[in-house]
């Protein structure tokens, strides 16, 4: 793990009021390394510069923390929440949220099986628990009783326009979620 990586990550997280442990920083760094390596053979992300990955992928994925008080969410570990990341792609925002908030139960949903395979590699390499990568389409899984109305939180990035995204996400959120 480089000093530059730690400095940039600490700075971005501090702006959000998040303090990461050394283990969490190591997990973010390993995730970064895996993203860069896999991106050589699979188009996971266009942004690959260290500072941009930290700012535009990792820290941006954690912006939920700013809305948490408004939504009545306590992400300090004092309450358990389930979260589905629809169209997760390379794991954003689901994996950064899981690293920063280990008590979160996360489902990563993506329509491409090869990305789901990569996400499973990341989950194993980082030693993450209570996180599952699922291959499927939101419009199908939103009708499946196993997933429909099962989550407190639904997150997504760069999937569709807001009206379409709402149609994808709302079926996953339980009443009061």
Language model: regions and residue ranges:
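Class I SAM-dependent transferase core
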Residues: 1-78, 84, 121-131
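Residue-level preference for alpha-helix termini and adjacent loops
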Residues: 19, 43-46, 52-53, 58, ...
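Solvent-exposed, non-transmembrane amphipathic alpha-helical segments
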Residues: 29, 55, 59, 117, ...
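Conserved SAM/SAH cofactor-binding pocket of Class I
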Residues: 62-160, 164-167
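A short helix->loop->beta-strand "cap" motif at the edges of active sites that frequently abuts
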Residues: 104, 176-177
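A short glycine-rich, Lys/Arg-flanked "PGG" loop and its adjoining helix->strand segment in the class I
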Residues: 164-176
